[in-house]
Amino acid sequence: MQEYEIRIVDAFTDRPFAGNPCGVVARAEGLTDAQMQAIARELNLSETAFVFPSERADFRVRFFTPLREIPLAGHPTIATMYTLAELGRIDLSAGAKRVMQELSVGVLPVDVERAADGRVRVVMTQAKPEF
């Protein structure tokens, strides 16, 4: 059986056990929809992110709640990009990078940088809501 590394990452904080937790599977190749849903249900966090290679962007990311897949999520995007930067999968040697992530709603930009103190900073922009 294939093994997958699952991280629990706290977004919006610089301290452990604070912020908003999210599951992140940084290399999800080979997982089926049913397996991703089972992992999200088992973790029982508000969202779990699964990262895949993409032909249209730097990464393809899918988000699952314990009950279903969702098209876009804020704090999981931040947790995912932080994780990919920490794993060295986002090159921050120039200090900052605009990363393109493919989601079911399209390709969206995320800005990732390494601050002078060494911490990773992630900024995402979303379209204005329509009511």
Indicate where each model-derived feature is located.
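Short beta-strand-to-turn element immediately C-terminal to the catalytic PLP-Schiff-base lysine
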Residues: 24-27, 51-52
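Anion-binding (especially nucleotide phosphate/pyrophosphate-binding) glycine-rich loop
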Residues: 35-70
